[in-house]
């Protein structure tokens, strides 16, 4: 029995290595925050003691977009299959918008079936549900599944790539240009560590993707084809929840690794490491640094003075706000808060209407802002009500 079990395990491992395939390309929450900015903070970035052994690197806290470490972060470099973060983002947006469903069947075309690199060996005319295509794309970085999804969404890979570049522009990815949807070496295909963090941050806004990025081992084709995640952080790093690995001879070993602890979501980008081990060790070092030195905390709500109401039944309006979770240095001072409210508002006002804002500061630097909203309705005085008030005053004087 023991020998049979051992043989079964060996056979399964062999099957996994066959399914992944040898190739040049590696096969190895919606945030509730409302922040005052979308750009990175470089003035506060805290450097590690030494330079990481890779071409470029970046550590970012996803909720705020604050950069905690940056190394050669805007250099245009090949990123291999890390490209698929943008491909996955477009798929997730299509799912969330109702354009496609996880149960929809994808028919494999000629281009997808003849892709090289890491793959799940799709055949022309084969049909597979979107959910399994996503597993293949995200878990084992399958180029054929990526192209199949691109064709399913946009009609052709070239049209899909145009959408990728348009979305990159919308996200402010100024040092990025995609020439394909999978990341294999191609002229004019490049990105940078900062831009990889930007698209990773956007993808994290789609919670569904984490159901795929956190898969360690799974199957497709009704259990006939095994999958093993190329991202080793998922199995070995506490809190790891994504995102994408990549490798080509030109790009070397790349990674956008994500992890979440105690409500803080970090993104560690590594581009151009010489070995897979260096890639994961460097990402771990960045993540360890972030979790050791920073935390996300929600400040206490301060009591706000009511706002005067003009032409309202009641003279004042109660207002409130919801403090956001804010990134702070461990052991540092809590951010200060400053309410910005009008002297008065005109009735009518509906409960929930925005009437001002509260701004949060770290020293003199604005770090976040949230709206101040009406805690109740403020009805407008009608002519009848006004006349009644006047009449009451007159009668009261007698």
Report the location of each language-model feature.
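Structural motif marking the loop-to-transmembrane transition
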Residues: 1-5, 79, 130, 383, ...
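A generic local structural motif
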Residues: 2, 10, 43-45, 254
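Sec-dependent N-terminal signal peptides of Gram-positive bacterial secreted proteins and lipoproteins
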Residues: 2-24
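Hydrophobic alpha-helical segments, especially transmembrane helices
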Residues: 3-4, 85, 261
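Generic detector of short, well-ordered, non-transmembrane alpha-helical segments enriched
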Residues: 10, 18-20, 61, 83, ...
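Residues in and immediately flanking transmembrane alpha helices
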Residues: 15-16, 97, 298-301
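Active-site-adjacent loops and short helices of periplasmic peptidoglycan-processing enzymes
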Residues: 22-207
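Domain-terminus/edge residues, biased toward the C-terminal soluble/receptor-binding domains
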Residues: 173-177, 185-398
């Amino acid at each position: 029995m023991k020998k049979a079990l051992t043989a079964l395990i060996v056979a399964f491992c062999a099957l996994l290595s066959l399914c992944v395939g040898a190739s040049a390309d590696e096969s190895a929450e919606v945030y509730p925050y409302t922040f005052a900015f979308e750009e990175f903070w470089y003035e506060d970035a805290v450097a590690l003691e030494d330079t990481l052994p890779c071409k470029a690197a970046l550590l970012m806290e996803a909720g705020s977009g604050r950069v905690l470490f940056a190394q050669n972060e805007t250099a245009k470099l090949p990123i291999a299959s890390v490209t698929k973060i943008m491909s996955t983002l477009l798929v997730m947006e299509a799912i969330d918008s109702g354009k496609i469903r996880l149960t929809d069947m994808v028919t494999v075309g000629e281009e997808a079936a003849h892709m090289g690199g890491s793959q799940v060996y799709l055949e022309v005319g084969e049909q597979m549900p979107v959910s399994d295509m996503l597993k293949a794309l995200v878990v084992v970085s399958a180029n054929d599944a990526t192209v199949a999804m691109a064709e399913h969404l946009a009609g052709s890979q070239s049209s899909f790539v145009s959408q990728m570049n348009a979305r990159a522009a919308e996200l402010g990815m100024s040092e990025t240009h995609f020439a394909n949807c999978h990341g294999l070496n191609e002229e004019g295909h490049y990105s940078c560590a900062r831009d990889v963090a930007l698209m990773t941050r956007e993808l994290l806004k789609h919670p569904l993707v984490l159901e795929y990025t956190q898969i360690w081992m799974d199957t497709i084709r009704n259990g006939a084809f095994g999958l093993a995640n190329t991202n080793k952080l998922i199995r070995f790093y506490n809190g790891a929840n994504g995102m994408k690995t990549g490798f080509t001879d030109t790009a070397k070993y790349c990674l956008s690794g994500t992890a979440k602890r105690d409500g803080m979501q970090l993104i560690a980008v590594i581009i151009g490491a010489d070995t897979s081990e260096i890639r994961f060790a460097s990402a771990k070092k960045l993540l360890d640094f972030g979790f050791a030195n920073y935390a996300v905390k929600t400040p206490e709500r301060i009591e706000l003075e009511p706002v005067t109401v003009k032409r309202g039944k009641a003279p004042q309006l109660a207002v409130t706000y919801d403090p956001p979770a804010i990134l702070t240095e461990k052991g540092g001072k809590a951010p200060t808060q400053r309410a910005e409210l009008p002297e008065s508002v005109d009735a009518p006002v509906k409960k929930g209407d925005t009437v001002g804002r509260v701004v949060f500061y770290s020293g003199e630097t604005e770090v976040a802002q949230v709206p101040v909203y009406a805690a109740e309705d403020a009805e407008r005085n009608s002519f009848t009500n006004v006349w009644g008030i006047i009449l009451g005053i007159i009668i009261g004087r007698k």
